[in-house]
Amino acid sequence: MLFFEYFKSQLNNEIIVNLKNDISISGILKNVDPFLNIKIENVIAISTNEFIKINKSITNIQLCSIRGSAIKSVELKKNGLEEHMVEATRIKCNLDC
């Protein structure tokens, strides 16, 4: 739940999602659920794999849903990252301890 709470606090911020198939998707984080399924708005897709080509029709996506199990990593801006993680850990410790 620690990551879920952190991502919920980052709604409407810019995000880059790196998928397991070497495609990176960037946009504005609109929603996340406890399974870390992510919804992104104003999507831009980039392929880092030379064998996967991104079609021009894919580049004009307004809203994209990404299944949590397909995500390799997530990149966010570092604005207050340490503060948010400490706060989320403190909340979790108070609830569990």
From Swiss-Prot:
Keyword Nucleus set for record: yes
Cellular component, GO, one term: catalytic step 2 spliceosome
Biological process according to GO: mRNA splicing, via spliceosome
Keywords: mRNA processing, mRNA splicing, Nucleus, Ribonucleoprotein, RNA-binding, Spliceosome
UniProt superkingdom: Eukaryota
A Pfam family the protein falls into: LSM
Designated name of the protein: Probable U6 snRNA-associated Sm-like protein LSm2
Species this chain originates from: Enterocytozoon bieneusi (strain H348) (Microsporidian parasite)
Lineage: Eukaryota, Fungi, Fungi incertae sedis, Microsporidia, Enterocytozoonidae
